[in-house]
Swiss-Prot record:
Effect of H182A: Loss of activity
Gene Ontology MF terms: 3'-tyrosyl-DNA phosphodiesterase activity; 5'-tyrosyl-DNA phosphodiesterase activity; double-stranded DNA binding; exonuclease activity; single-stranded DNA binding
Gene coding for it: TDP1
Further facts: Present with 2130 molecules/cell in log phase SD medium.
Keywords: DNA damage, DNA repair, Exonuclease, Hydrolase, Nuclease, Nucleus, Repeat
Protein name listed in UniProt: Tyrosyl-DNA phosphodiesterase 1
Gene3D superfamilies: Endonuclease Chain A
Family: Belongs to the tyrosyl-DNA phosphodiesterase family.
InterPro entries, sorted: Tdp1
Broad enzyme group: hydrolase
Binding site for substrate: K184, K434
Interaction with DNA: annotated span: 312-316
Amino acid sequence: MSRETNFNGTKRKRSDVAEKVAQRWKSVRYSAEMENMAPVNSNNDSDDCVIVSESKIIDLTNQEQDLSERIETNDTAKGAVFKLMKSDFYEREDFMGEVEDMITLKDIFGTETLKRSILFSFQYELDFLLRQFHQNVENITIVGQKGTIMPIEARAMDATLAVILKKVKLIEITMPPFASHHTKLIINFYDNGECKIFLPSNNFTSMETNLPQQVCWCSPLLKIGKEGLPVPFKRSLIEYLNSYHLKDIDELITKSVEEVNFAPLSELEFVYSTPSKFQSSGLLSFYNKLEKLSAGTSASDTAKHYLCQTSSIGTSLSRARDENLWTHLMIPLFTGIMSPPAKDTAGRKKAEILPTNSLINEYSQRKIKPYIIFPTEQEFVTSPLKWSSSGWFHFQYLQKKSYYEMLRNKFKVFYKQDPAMVTRRRGTTPAHSKFYMHCATNSAGPCDASQVFKELEWCLYTSANLSQTAWGTVSRKPRNYEAGVLYHSRRLANTRKVTCRTFTRDRRGCAGNPTHVAVPFTLPVIPYDLAEDECFCLARHEND
């Protein structure tokens, strides 16, 4: 077994697979701004294993190499779908499972009909990423934060990579300390004029793609042309692109997106965060969308369930009090416990956050049940690759244990996967995805836990973790760029509910009634055993 250095310089053991992660990044130092300057209460919640220092892409060679292999996409679904990212570790050559539920980066980038690809992400490992492309691709536009793009090492460069690298256009985004260009978005254009959009939960590095569980939202094929009616998804996507205020994005990306007919996505909403001071985004924008769509839908005889599955939990909203973004701000806003944001005499939006005990009473009276899915220490122990995927999960609660104990012991908000329902190959491996969802059940009789979160009022799949950095608050703008897709029952035809299933056991819906959302964790989830379960925390293992 090898040993690795933790953030504070102490040593701990790591597995052989974790050693491979370290070898991949061993020549890259951590960003001094992000790691050394972050104060205790900074809400820096990067959910990624490392943040690399600024680098430049190396010069191209003139060598070329033809690829005879022709790769075809196998996704023929007419509507938007969720897929599980296939893993080189969990699904090996002998895998015979539900391949229709899975996708690879080769499926996304490797088709010979792909003409242009536009990528937004937080981390890029170029020698891994560019090998996923077919040689026929004409242009690859990469939008990334300075210091997060891993160049191709000289010893890894070959003729195939050199050919692809010549087609790359890099747009670098300068971000302030403790902020991230965290959006994960792919826009593909094909040689027949069609377009397709993907929202993966992973950044473009080998280990992040393969070690934690990852998912990908895939749009249907979109044609070039005009819509008969305005499409909110398109409008919000263009607003997001405009928020960069960069000529290269306007010329190379926005103009192309404007030519696409987004009518097939008319039932969905694009939800985003941007640090731009000129646009409303993040929590306030999401709240406004829900308010507009949810008007008149509340019922007094229902129990209301609100679930957040995340790979990172930010620090308390307040230094003086223990306040969590989900339990103390988002759910109270969504349910009307908290009054809508109002401006004071100085024009600033304000919100009065109730004390914890008052909120717990309100939740009880209004039949509101909050859930946060976050991996336990034991889930890593029982997962196939043990601690190897743990580097992508962050909740540094030892710095303020009262905050953690409030969530765990007072709200009893933490839930985990049901170990009896996980798959043999992936086991209790946690998911790096971020889902926010709401459903209602009849409160007159006993609640059937197996049916909770099968039919939803709404579901947001996003890159945004549970933090102020990603979402902002009522009075603060987000610091990150984030992107996601919102399903809402009021947008669906025939007043349907948003249907949800799990990849672990449920099969795809029949052709006439497909499921809208698929999640990489078990449904139902089960509550933490307060006598045994603790949230995973890296600091617990500093001296292992």
